């Protein structure tokens, strides 16, 4: 039950629209691209910077900076209106959708980045243990 207690808080109808936006984003917004891009950055930085250039600290810093930057990304208002034209003039629905969407993007980015770093590290260790490292691009 929601009851606004201070001036400047959402009214009951406004909060209903915010919650509706969050619920719809939770059920239908699937930012798979954030996970895939995070995986590519995580694995690529560990393999290339960590193994090829032999800079392990930098290879860990790149995915962390990438994931931090992606924590500010959110679904666009234009994209939300395209999927839900009936809420075109409802800024509270858009706010709720963007709020939940931002969290899902951040979580998927972190999961993908950590997964990529693990896969990149295991692959790098496997390549180093065999001693036969063949790089596609030579300096």
Please report, for each region that a protein language model flagged, where it lies by residue:
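Hydrophobic alpha-helical membrane segments
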Residues: 5-139
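Periplasmic N-terminal soluble interaction domains immediately after the signal peptide in Gram-negative
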Residues: 1-3
């Amino acid at each position: 039950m929601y009851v606004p207690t201070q001036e400047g808080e959402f009214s009951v109808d406004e909060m209903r629209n915010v919650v509706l936006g969050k619920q719809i984003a939770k059920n239908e917004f699937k930012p798979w691209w954030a996970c895939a891009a995070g995986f590519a950055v995580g694995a690529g930085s560990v393999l290339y910077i960590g193994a090829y250039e032999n800079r392990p600290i930098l290879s860990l810093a790149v995915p962390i900076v990438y994931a931090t930057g992606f924590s500010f990304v959110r679904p666009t208002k234009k994209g939300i209106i395209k999927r839900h034209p009936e809420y075109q003039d409802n800024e509270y629905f858009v706010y709720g959708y963007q709020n939940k969407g931002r969290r899902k993007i951040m979580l998927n980015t972190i999961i993908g980045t950590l997964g990529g770093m693990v896969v990149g590290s295991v692959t790098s260790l496997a390549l180093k243990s065999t001693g036969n490292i063949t790089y596609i691009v030579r300096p």
